[in-house]
Swiss-Prot record:
GO molecular function list: structural constituent of ribosome
SUPFAM superfamilies the record matches: L28p-like
Gene that encodes it: rpmB
Pfam families listed in its UniProt record: Ribosomal_L28 (PF00830)
Lineage: Bacteria, Bacillati, Bacillota, Bacilli, Lactobacillales
One example of a Gene Ontology biological process annotation: translation
Naturally occurring in which organism (per UniProt): Oenococcus oeni (strain ATCC BAA-331 / PSU-1)
Residue runs in coiled coils: none
Protein name per UniProt: Large ribosomal subunit protein bL28
């Protein structure tokens, strides 16, 4: 399974509950994007980041797209 290079976010598992509270297994997948970035000014590298992490990093300046 792929995971976010910064936050470590990966697929989560749990149950989908119906009105009668029957349990069916399901998963929640993070919105992973393969991007080439510079993290904190280091060399450019290709990593997987969630869209949420990418947006936050671009806004606060810790991530720079290449």
């Amino acid at each position: 399974m792929a995971k976010d290079a910064i936050t470590g976010a990966r697929t989560r598992f749990g149950n989908q509950r119906s009105h009668a509270l029957n349990a069916n297994r399901r998963s929640w997948k993070p919105n992973l994007q393969k991007v080439t970035v510079k993290i904190n000014g280091d060399a450019a590298k290709t990593v997987y980041l969630t869209a949420r992490t990418l947006r936050a990093g671009l806004k606060n300046g810790s991530i720079e797209r290449v």
